[in-house]
Amino acid sequence: MRGNFMSSIEKLGGLKQRLTITVPAEEVDKAYKSRLLKVARTAKIPKFRPGKASPAVVEKLYGKAILQEVGSELIQSSLREAVEEHQLRVAGAPDIKMDKILRGEPFKYVVNFEVYPEITLESLAGETIERTQVEITEEDLDKMLEALRKQYAEWKEMDRPAKADDRVIIDFEGTLDGKPFERGSAKDFQLELGSKRMIAGFEEGIEGMKPGESKALDITFPADYPSEDLAGKAAVFNITLQKVMAPELPVLDEQFAERLGIKEGGLEALRQKVRTNMEKEVHHHMENKLKMAVLDKLIERNPIEVPESLIEAEIDHLQQMTRQQVAMQTHKPDEAKKMELPRDPYREQATKRVKLGLLLAEVVKQHKIKADPEQLRARVEEVAASYQDPEKVISWYYTNKQMLSEIESVVLEDQAVAQLMSELEVKDQAIPYEEAVKQIQQ
């Protein structure tokens, strides 16, 4: 309908705007007649051959429905043209309120919407961030190998008092003021002493007990205990120790290396593989930490207002991710889909993600960044490496445009971050491996 309508725009404050569009009566009638004739050519009406009923008959039967369809078509075409005419960058889905459409009268509707913010990027020049360097010593490597030995330990039943690092099988019943409380008891419960899996005083109280011995422990729940019914309360746990088991660690030799998939090179090859895995883990974490530091600087230097509609959409996305995680953990997808989740806890994260998305898109645009084919290939290979047939997965990605574009977005983001890093000063800071592990676990 190119240009056959009137439109006016009103700025409502912030990123909110309103379009008022009026389509002249003659355009409404023209569109109605055209639609009526089109329907008449294909309509199947009793007592008439297909397409042979007169427009008057068709109008009597379908006039109201045709008029509604015309309204939808006029909105679609005129709104698209109005957005182009006013050079609007509409964010999210617009809210359309329309008057009743009538033949012979102008058709008016109002569109409330948000626009994307105008962004003028500020350089990060003058900013400083710290890059963490982690050195893995031989002592760190020895500790990791010892941890691996413990993972592959065989547990032998012992006829002696329990001590730290033992695995015990117990029956216990907890009471408050002499009454059992929910989830306060268990039978044949397996516990490793020193794991700090239970509240303070529980595991320590078992140390020194002998198999078959029973004991009452007076323990107070911490004030910040997650269950409000138990927080700060004094409880009594009646415990019976069934079994004491101690770990028998495998010898650190070529046979142990073979158990871990090392077919050649023996212990030396195992040490190298373990060191490589340790380096990969800390490198991945520290790279992410560095990336987030750069992105935080980007947000600090470029405060922008973001469309509320995009924040709400991102909250929906984050909630969907939560439901998927719950479904995987519980193996109850139907229940997870129905989970009622509050929106406010997601708002801060959603707002930050939307800001970063807009700012990074501007970095890519301003610096004319294109996804580097070599980096893209490396990313695809990294993903494919975790599958049984990597080459097949790689081929699948390169024949699936949608999936490849998702990895391309990650590569573009990495390249944008690299561009930002070139603008600021990076200072290296060395920390011990144990400190790096603590940061990873936080």
Swiss-Prot record:
GO terms for molecular function: peptidyl-prolyl cis-trans isomerase activity; protein folding chaperone; ribosome binding. It catalyses: [protein]-peptidylproline (omega=180) = [protein]-peptidylproline (omega=0). Keywords: Cell cycle, Cell division, Chaperone, Cytoplasm, Isomerase, Rotamase. It is found in: Cytoplasm. Its EC number is 5.2.1.8. InterPro entries: PPIase_dom_sf, PPIase_FKBP_dom, Trig_fac, Trigger_fac_C, Trigger_fac_C_sf, Trigger_fac_ribosome-bd_bac, Trigger_fac_ribosome-bd_sf, Trigger_fact/SurA_dom_sf. Involved in protein export. Acts as a chaperone by maintaining the newly synthesized protein in an open conformation. Functions as a peptidyl-prolyl cis-trans isomerase. Belongs to the FKBP-type PPIase family. Tig subfamily. HAMAP family: Trigger_factor_Tig. This is Trigger factor. It comes from Coxiella burnetii (strain RSA 493 / Nine Mile phase I). The lineage of its organism: Bacteria, Pseudomonadati, Pseudomonadota, Gammaproteobacteria, Legionellales. The gene is tig.
